[in-house]
């Protein structure tokens, strides 16, 4: 869930994931939304991760005017809860961070890593190409061993960001599909709001494929994502692996 964790809830999200899985589209979810304390399916973040197979981590907004502006202590505590629960559950649960435009950038994460013995892999910040200062933080975070997500618009512009990473296996690309986007006036009022189309992801892959080739372009959308989420036997075309393919009218597979 995103901004709206009030009229929408984790129960509905869980039900939709279960429906998709029954239709042979493997679906996983994150508990929580932009806000803190985390809205959960059970009584706690730990129970959600330990007892519900399809929950692979927690969602939270950082450095965004719509976030709860979690304190350093609260962030360390939440990360520790996720860490402990993932060890018990045998998962690679992470804290997926919606990153906003505020100047703090990834500083809350850097502070948490300095204060506690938390693996850098537990944090996965998204929208990291939305402004120059956040992208600079993202490059630093990746050099520390962390993974980052770039949001695509379907126009191939992520290539210029990808080129700046020393290790591209640390990068995933997503579309924020069916999520809301918004722009604001100087006084903070909403200027425009809309929905990000699912098609952006496919358009971005085709654009990158034309520049980089299949083998280099595909992992950002598949293998790297599976690695971040700790999903085994998926993310690549290999004997014994689960693979989802879409066939186009001309016989091409995506």
Where are the regions a protein language model picked out?
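Residue-level "edge-of-site" marker
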Residues: 2-3, 33, 154, 220-222
């Amino acid at each position: 869930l995103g901004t709206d964790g009030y009229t929408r809830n984790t129960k509905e999200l869980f039900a939709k994931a279960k429906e998709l899985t029954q239709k042979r589209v493997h679906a996983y979810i994150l508990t929580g939304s932009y806000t803190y304390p985390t809205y959960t399916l059970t009584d706690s973040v730990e129970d959600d991760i330990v007892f519900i197979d399809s929950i692979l981590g927690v969602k939270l907004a950082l450095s965004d005017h719509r976030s709860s502006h979690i304190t350093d202590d609260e962030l360390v505590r939440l990360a520790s809860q996720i860490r402990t629960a993932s060890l018990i559950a045998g998962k690679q649960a992470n804290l997926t961070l919606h990153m906003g435009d505020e100047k703090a950038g990834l500083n809350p994460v850097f502070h948490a890593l300095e204060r506690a013995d938390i693996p850098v892999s537990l944090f996965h910040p998204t929208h990291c190409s939305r402004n120059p200062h956040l992208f600079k933080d993202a490059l630093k975070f990746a050099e520390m061993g962390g993974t980052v997500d770039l949001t695509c618009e379907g126009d191939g512009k992520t290539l210029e960001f990808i080129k700046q990473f020393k290790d591209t296996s640390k990068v995933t690309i997503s579309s924020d599909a069916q999520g809301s986007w918004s722009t604001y006036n100087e006084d903070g009022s909403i200027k425009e709001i809309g929905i990000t189309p699912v098609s952006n992801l496919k358009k971005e892959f085709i654009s990158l494929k034309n520049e980089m080739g299949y083998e280099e372009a595909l992992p950002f959308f598949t293998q790297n994502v599976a690695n971040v989420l700790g999903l085994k036997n998926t993310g690549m075309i290999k004997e014994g692996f689960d693979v989802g393919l879409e066939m186009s009218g001309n016989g091409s597979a995506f």
